[in-house]
UniProtKB/Swiss-Prot annotation:
It catalyses: Release of signal peptides from bacterial membrane prolipoproteins. Hydrolyzes -Xaa-Yaa-Zaa-|-(S,diacylglyceryl)Cys-, in which Xaa is hydrophobic (preferably Leu), and Yaa (Ala or Ser) and Zaa (Gly or Ala) have small, neutral side chains. The active site is at D122, D140. It is a multi-pass membrane protein. Its EC number is 3.4.23.36. Keywords: Aspartyl protease, Cell inner membrane, Cell membrane, Hydrolase, Membrane, Protease, Transmembrane, Transmembrane helix. This is Lipoprotein signal peptidase. GO terms for cellular component: plasma membrane.
Length: 164
């Protein structure tokens, strides 16, 4: 098991880097912004802001009275545990392991928010004219990119039937 763990070090480092970058960025925003304050970075395209999300992506279940905090905590920990196990058992090729590590780091970054603040801290706001993409954070970005990598890994290796 120790050789398996040591050969996977780069994935644990990636997950930890995602958590650290996410938490540092949220600390910087929480230290610099008032709730709902917005600062334009790229005119008509990108702002930094501070908003709280008690739900999931796109504020899914945000207005449900609080139970969703525990649901998303359990879900994130369960998915992360499954992905850790999958990495350790070599159930993914390199691309999939990289994606899994990114998902783990992002999920645990948001878990930390839920435990400390009771909600997730979001601050990246992209928009065009009257269209706004929901505010999100670095952890969400790691989760999304990780999911794309995992899907690509699955598509590529489903075709050739082997892991690399």
């Amino acid at each position: 098991m120790s050789s398996s763990v040591s050969s996977k070090t780069r994935y644990w480092v990636l997950a930890l880097a995602a958590i650290v970058l996410d938490q540092w960025s949220k600390w910087a925003v929480l230290s610099s912004f008032q709730y709902r304050e917005r600062v334009n970075v790229i005119p008509s395209f990108f702002d930094l802001t501070l908003v709280y999300n008690p739900g999931a992506a796109f504020s899914f279940l945000a207005d449900q009275g609080g139970w969703q905090k525990y649901f998303f905590l359990v879900l994130a920990v369960a998915v992360s545990a499954y992905l850790v196990r999958a990495i350790l058992r070599d159930e993914f090729a390199t691309l999939g392991k990289t994606g899994a590590a990114m998902i783990i780091g992002g999920a645990l970054g948001n878990v930390i928010d839920r435990l400390i603040h009771g909600h997730v801290v979001d601050f990246l706001l992209f928009y065009w004219q009257n269209w706004f993409y929901p505010a999100f954070n670095i952890a969400d970005s790691f989760i999304c990119v990780g999911a794309v990598l995992a899907v690509l890994d699955n598509i590529v290796h489903r075709k050739d039937g082997k892991k690399t």
